[in-house]
Amino acid sequence: MTTVLQRRESASAWERFCSFITSTNNRLYIGWFGVLMIPTLLTAVTCFVIAFIGAPPVDIDGIREPVAGSLLYGNNIITGAVVPSSNAIGLHLYPIWEAASLDEWLYNGGPYQLIIFHYMIGCICYLGRQWEYSYRLGMRPWICVAYSAPLAATYSVFLIYPLGQGSFSDGMPLGISGTFNFMFVFQAEHNILMHPFHMFGVAGVLGGSLFAAMHGSLVSSTLVRETTEGESANYGYKFGQEEETYNIVAAHGYFGRLIFQYASFSNSRSLHFFLGAWPVVCIWLTAMGISTMAFNLNGFNFNHSIVDSQGNVVNTWADVLNRANLGFEVMHERNAHNFPLDLAAGESAPVALTAPVING
């Protein structure tokens, strides 16, 4: 008998790297999207932490009135934020090497652009990584589809809205109070509360919370008991078991009699599709609403829509909301604007009849 031994050629370093990156046996799946996701998110997080702690004030309105957002300049966790880049920069990309000095880059809010661009790249790579991991495991791709809803919302406030308004200074600040300030100003300028797509978003968030609470409570209340009365019902469950862990027939019967028959799902797949689709579709619509309002296609205006027989205005809640919008409008960027168009009451008057003579 003859035995032939053949030496196996060792894999190249590139092949070993590819095998490691695409392996589904790693504790954390990396994937090709992860190769780009990891450095971009690390860059965004590192710059955010440093800027939140110690960035100097930023001339956000471009009028030489810097706004402080970091902890070392007197803010706390609630009021602190990474202030958006200056209105003097507009939509220009502003990397460090475009500034004359590091101080100038910080003064004009360069860290904001660095953070949001790396963050948006990292987030969309995270979506791609979800699809890639599902593909390698033979799963369907709906996880990344669901994640696309918050991703669309992120892109709408950090990219689409500044593009529509003409400056990254209109982007959402990276902080708690900054987020609320962004919401108030958005309401004042676009009347988002009266936009149908925002109403869908409210229905998606609040309705999704309600549906999740209802589903979780029904499942927890109809667990199939495999233990004695003296033991927790949780001990009767084994990870990966083939049997149903709860009785969907009992849950369907309970909920159908609590409200009415057709308000309850009898099919588990239909139920879980609805639980996933409802908030996702509504957040998609919200992102679409912000993206359209970015180009000033604003919410409905029902101001002074009701008058009596004498022609006098009968105020409605739309008029109350409009007064609140005007209050927000005059409070923000107080020194950056003079007489906003929606507050101008009379005809415009010239402030100078002739050009001044400069002797110098």
UniProtKB/Swiss-Prot annotation:
The lineage of its organism: Bacteria, Bacillati, Cyanobacteriota, Cyanophyceae, Acaryochloridales. Belongs to the reaction center PufL/M/PsbA/D family. This is Photosystem II protein D1 2. The record marks Y161 as: Tyrosine radical intermediate. It is found in: Cellular thylakoid membrane. A quinone binds at H215, S264, F265. Residues 345-360 form a propeptide. Keywords: Calcium, Chlorophyll, Chromophore, Electron transport, Herbicide resistance, Iron, Magnesium, Manganese, Membrane, Metal-binding, Oxidoreductase, Photosynthesis, Photosystem II, Thylakoid, Transmembrane, Transmembrane helix, Transport. Tyr-161 forms a radical intermediate that is referred to as redox-active TyrZ, YZ or Y-Z. It catalyses: 2 a plastoquinone + 4 hnu + 2 H2O = 2 a plastoquinol + O2. The gene is psbA2. Cyanobacteria usually contain more than 2 copies of the psbA gene. 2 of the reaction center chlorophylls (ChlD1 and ChlD2) are entirely coordinated by water. One of its GO terms (molecular function) is chlorophyll binding. It is an enzyme of class 1 (oxidoreductase). The chain crosses the membrane at residues 29-46, 118-133, 142-156, 197-218, 274-288.
